[in-house]
Amino acid sequence: MVSDILFLHCSTNDVTLQNYELIKKYNPTKNVYPIGFENHDLLDDSHIVVRKQEYPNNHVLNEMYGNKYWSEADLLIYDFYLHNPNLSSYLVLEWDTYCNCSLESFYGESLYSDTFSHIIHTECNINDWYWYTMLTDEQKLIPSIGGITPTSGLLFKNVVLSQMTEKLLANPRCYDNMFSELRLGTLLQQCGYKLTTPFSDSDKYISWDFDNIVFDTSQSGYYHPIKTLV
């Protein structure tokens, strides 16, 4: 069962604080680790990530979108793993994820899975995904291209994240200028794992766009993106 939650964030605004406290409230027996990039206003005791040459870089994407860090949130996950390689599993939640129940109440037996994400992009549906279309023709030849999205509601067992991180570090330049969620899904498939969701309508709770979810505080769940106080 999951004991460790990675809380990815970039500021200490009111919504971040609200959602961080709710995650801790509804999961009192779990460790919640705040994680963020350097040069940001982070929560106390955060794991601070410094980008390194040993990691992929998204300089082209970041310049296109005017943000130095937005497209490479996956680096937070790999870096945290490298500093904490002995946890049994890693459950990732972003700062704009609202919850009103425990992980067990929401995910149930899915927490015993090797990995899951709320939306998956495989060879069956990836061609129309925006971040896939942004790849160069050469990048599209990379084997096992896939995507998981958003970077919240993700589960990785230790062995899974270990293999992904090892493959990434073995050839970081191969993964330059790939959007983080594309890099995550590709690494998962390259390591031999199937992209899976925790349950059939998981995209109604956690998605990349608020208009795609059914946000109902009377129903127990984890919801993303929630960028306002509730």
Model regions: which residues?
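Short loop->beta transition adjacent to catalytic acidic/histidine clusters or analogous donor-positioning motifs
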Residues: 2-4, 26-34
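Active-site-proximal specificity loops/subdomain of glycosyltransferases
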Residues: 36-86
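Short, well-formed alpha-helical segments that are part of the catalytic scaffolds
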Residues: 13-26
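C-terminal catalytic/acceptor-binding lobe
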Residues: 170-230
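N-proximal low-complexity "stem/linker" segments adjacent to membrane-targeting elements
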Residues: 1-14
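Short beta-strand-to-loop acidic/aromatic patch adjacent to the donor-nucleotide binding site
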Residues: 87-96
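Conserved catalytic core of nucleotide-sugar-dependent glycosyltransferases
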Residues: 98-181
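Short acidic, S/G/P-rich loop/turn micro-motifs used as interaction or catalytic elements
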Residues: 11-16, 96-100
